[in-house]
Amino acid sequence: MASFHIIVSYVTVVLAIIIAITFAARRFWISRYRSIRYSPVENSFEADFNNGLNSSSFDIAQNILAQDTRAGLDEAATSQIRGLMKQLQCSFDQARLIYIRKVMSDNNVDSTGMPLDNKAVTKL
């Protein structure tokens, strides 16, 4: 019975040492995990302009000239619009229109901007 208590005490000491080492090294592992998980996206108006996401009706050149520091266009939307441009061989404006119509349709809104939900209040 004494050997059982000795084994339990050794296991307890070993676990305490492992916990202490883990606690002491947490700053290293947390920073390492964050650097692996997070990678900055190269998303700016200049990058969008260089990728052809610009037209006379959607002019982001003014943002570039004004040295706008905002992140640029939405990354998910730009990748879908670029895909539409490539797949349908259409211009940026046409692809943007197709994308916006799809987003509106997915959100139950018709092409005029009116909600298709019969419970929606549109007039007061």
Curated annotation (Swiss-Prot):
Pfam families for this protein: DUF2015
GO cellular component assignments: cytoplasm
Signal peptide limits: 1-24
Mitochondrion as UniProt keyword: no
UniProt keywords, alphabetically: Signal
InterPro entries the UniProt entry points to: DUF2015 (IPR018559)
Family the UniProt entry places it in: Belongs to the UPF0357 family.
PANTHER family, sorted: UPF0357 PROTEIN YCL012C
The name this protein goes by in its record: UPF0357 protein C1687.07
Gene source species: Schizosaccharomyces pombe (strain 972 / ATCC 24843)
